[in-house]
Amino acid sequence: MTDAGPGATAVPRAPGNGTGGAPVPSSPVVPSDVPHHRTAGDGWVECACGRRHWGRFGAAGLLLARRDASGVPVAVVLQHRAPWSDQGGTWGLPGGALAPDEDAVTGALREAAEEAGIDPSDVRPTGTSVLRHPDWSYTTVLADEIHPAEPTATDAESVEVRWVPVDEVADLPLLAAFGDAWPDLRRRLGAGPDTADALPGGAPTA
Ligand SMILES: [Zn+2]
């Protein structure tokens, strides 16, 4: 509730983060003074739904949950998107375009490592949720924290990456698609891997 509102895109930089206090660009140009990863899947898809989406081979993101001792999810990792990015200033999942022939789990973990400094060995994927469009798809990879993970913004795509209490997620200005998906994703986190597309190795469902 102390976070900047949706109109506040000029987030002050923390001192001493190595960027020298450069102004936050207001134009949709990737800053050149911060790391930015590229894959062969980077690019827009003109979708038959009438919109365009990022990721020539689809996209994926990581929904990483921290649970309390009784297994109840208490926080998830969210990314505060850089002002220059699509729907800049909103909060969503660390993730991005899949590389050619890259499966969604691999891609989501790769992007989470690149953007949020999340070590894949600290994470256990538990399931996926796929949003299908005519010419594109987005896979949310649900995962549990198995070793303490301290995410941080590690490239140009994030203003901030942090644990957000589950009960506070809906109060943030969310990326539209993530906001639409959040009620179902939250239910799935709470219910555990109870659906048909739970990953092999998850808890038995029958
Ligand atoms: Zn579409």
PLM features: residue spans?
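N-terminal leader/linker segments that precede catalytic domains of diphosphate-processing enzymes
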Residues: 1-90, 96-148, 194-206
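Alpha-helix boundary/capping residues
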Residues: 111, 115, 176, 185-192
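Short, surface-exposed secondary-structure junctions/capping segments
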Residues: 98-100, 171-186
